[in-house]
């Protein structure tokens, strides 16, 4: 435990580990005053937020929580975790008195917020937490090697997730909405973006929906477009909608799973000729609403890579018999390459390329080296940038640079350490290499989109290593995906912030936009001031 504290070297996590290291779990002692607040800040606020807005998880200060659950039920959820969710068991980290202190803090803070005052300012809670969303349009940014201006091309997208350019310069944008929209966008803005009709039935909820979109490498010849989306068993009825204030672990969900398909778009903007590339058996489907992963990548050698998260159960990541928590490699038609690493491993899925992943949301190939890079959400901190290699184990379920009950090791023999990792969390999503010539100093850089951090990061890659990085911009909205257009410019999908301080639950649809980064040269700057 003390070794783990030193490895993290972060105040919030160190506070939690210091408290939990003083006494063995289950020891009978009275929690000192204020301990519940400190434990909550270190272990809970990262997911549940610190006010009524909540975070990735629901607010634990909602007074309705205590009308639907008894204190013993809340205690059990903290101690044992919640099946089919991201809530891990804390029983091995916190003793009974410490859990009780957290519950006492939930009661007191809930009453405080319900009374309309915040702990720090005394201002009305609603006034303290609600802010207007930022507007990135027109923002001039000065980065280390390039000045640019953000231009909004399309506004009011509905929770956009993936983007991919067609050869003619138009681009496809997937929207992770209740209906799952695929938009065909003209970057010039000359026409409203039409919606592609005839898509497959898409399961939506929490992380689910229409996810990535990718244009096949031979599109000019065969017209194939690839989609990743969440699917549920149509033979099962939809559970009734939960009553307002229902605790997350009491919400009933249909089992669901990531599916990869390809199809074509005809002249009437209809999805046609669909073929399945990957579909798991019904037994793999899970009611969890978390960690679908779902990015698609082509390697230029006739292979398709795609990512699937472990769906909130870290045991899946180390199990080669399940597709969950893996990067997969198939041929363009979904067949299995003969040289995949586990083709001859008894009980293993032959599509697996690498394993030990939590929630991989970014995949990119370095055009200079052919090496594949990945971004991955950690638990509380411990987000990763990984170099993905054949048959490698990236450790989730056994090791983590973040805070996860049940995991004490930060590294282990036979498990690959990340090339870069982040604490506190930035929630990395889409990534992409830039190989154009429109931005001086950016050629060869890996760009990383960050959700919680509301950041676009630029990483300098040399061979197999991350040698430097900068935050290109931040605090302008959640940054979801990035792509280089045929014009050599960078296009970015962004959404309004969610969670604490924004009065928007992260599970709700949220307004998004497509922006372009227009380079500013020194000649333009000098002309402006003449």
Regions found by a protein language model. Name each.
Residues 9-20:
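Bacterial N-terminal signal peptides
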Residues 22-39, 292, 349:
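Electrostatic cytochrome c docking/interface patches
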Residues 46, 51-56, 61-113, 209, ...:
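Extracytoplasmic electron-transfer domains, predominantly the class I c-type cytochrome c fold
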Residues 95, 99, 109-314, 362-365, ...:
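Acidic, Gly/Ser/Thr-rich repeat motifs that build Ca2+-stabilized beta-propeller blades
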Residues 194-208, 273-291, 332-353, 396-423:
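Surface-exposed loop and turn segments in beta-propeller and other repeat-based domains
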Residues 348-384:
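Repeat-solenoid scaffold signature
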Residues 357, 466-486:
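Conserved blade-ending motifs and adjacent loop-strand segments that build the rim/top face
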């Amino acid at each position: 435990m003390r070794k783990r504290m030193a490895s993290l070297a972060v105040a919030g996590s160190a506070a939690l580990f210091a408290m939990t290291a003083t006494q063995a779990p289950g020891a009978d002692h009275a929690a000192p005053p204020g301990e519940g607040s400190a434990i909550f800040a270190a272990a809970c606020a990262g997911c549940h937020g610190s006010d009524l807005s909540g975070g990735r998880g629901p607010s634990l200060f909602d007074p309705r929580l205590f009308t639907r659950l008894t204190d013993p039920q809340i205690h059990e959820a903290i101690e044992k975790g919640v099946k089919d969710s991201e809530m891990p068991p804390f029983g091995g980290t916190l003793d009974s008195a410490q859990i009780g202190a957290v519950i006492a803090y939930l009661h007191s803070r809930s009453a405080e917020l319900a009374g309309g005052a915040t702990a720090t300012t005394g201002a009305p809670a609603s006034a303290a937490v609600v802010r207007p969303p930022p507007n990135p349009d027109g923002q001039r940014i000065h980065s280390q090697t390039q000045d640019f201006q953000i231009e909004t091309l399309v506004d009011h997208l509905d929770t956009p997730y993936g983007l991919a350019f067609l050869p003619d310069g138009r681009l496809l944008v997937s929207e992770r909405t209740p209906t799952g929209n695929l938009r065909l966008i003209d970057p010039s803005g000359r026409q409203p973006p039409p919606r592609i009709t005839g898509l497959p039935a898409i399961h939506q909820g929490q992380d689910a929906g229409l996810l990535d979109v990718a244009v096949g490498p031979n599109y000019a010849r065969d017209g194939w477009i690839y989609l990743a989306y969440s699917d549920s068993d149509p033979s099962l009825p939809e559970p009734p909608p939960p009553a307002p204030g229902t605790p997350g672990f009491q919400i009933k969900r249909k089992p669901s799973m990531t599916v990869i398909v390809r199809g074509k778009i005809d002249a009437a903007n209809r999805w046609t000729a669909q073929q399945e590339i990957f579909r798991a058996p019904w037994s793999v489907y899970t009611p969890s609403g978390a960690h679908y992963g779902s990015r698609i990548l082509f390697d230029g050698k006739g292979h398709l890579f795609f990512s699937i998260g472990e769906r909130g159960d870290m045991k899946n990541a180390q199990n080669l018999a399940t597709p969950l928590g893996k990067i997969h490699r198939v041929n363009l038609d979904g067949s299995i390459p003969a040289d995949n690493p586990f083709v001859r491993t008894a009980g293993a899925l032959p599509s697996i390329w690498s394993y030990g992943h939590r929630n991989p949301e970014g995949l990119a190939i370095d055009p200079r080296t052919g090496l594949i890079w990945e971004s991955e959400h950690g638990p509380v901190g411990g987000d990763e940038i990984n170099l993905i290699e054949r048959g490698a184990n990236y450790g989730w379920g056994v090791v983590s640079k973040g805070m996860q009950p049940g995991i004490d090791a930060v590294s282990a023999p036979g498990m690959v350490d990340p090339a870069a990792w982040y604490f506190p969390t930035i929630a990395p999503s889409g990534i992409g290499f830039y190989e154009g010539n429109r931005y001086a100093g950016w050629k060869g850089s890996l760009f990383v989109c960050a959700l919680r951090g509301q950041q676009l990061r630029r990483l300098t890659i040399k061979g197999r290593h991350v040698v430097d990085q900068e935050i290109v911009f931040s605090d302008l909205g959640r940054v979801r995906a990035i792509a280089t257009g045929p014009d050599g410019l960078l296009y970015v999908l962004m959404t309004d912030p969610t969670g604490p301080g924004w009065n928007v639950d992260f599970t709700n649809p949220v307004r998004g936009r497509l922006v372009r980064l227009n380079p500013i040269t020194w000649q333009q700057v000098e002309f402006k001031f003449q």
